[in-house]
Amino acid sequence: MISDGVRTIWCRELKRDDISGDDDFFALGGQSVIMARIQGAYIEELGVEVPMDQMYLNPTVASISAYIASLGAATR
């Protein structure tokens, strides 16, 4: 499931294990360097390129997962 993959990436990059689907990336301490690492992980681990503007527009696991699903992306 895409949201599981997204959550795994966020937990690793934000160094937290308690991220829920509606937690806001920025409220969790996210910033541009971490966002760039997450963007790379999406490509490498989920096989989908997510533009930076979409990452800003979809700052929760649930919303970015829905965006990725709307692309028809499949996890590897």
Question: What do these predicted ranges mean?
Answer:
Residues 1-76:
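Phosphopantetheine-dependent thiolation modules in NRPS/PKS and related acyl-activating systems
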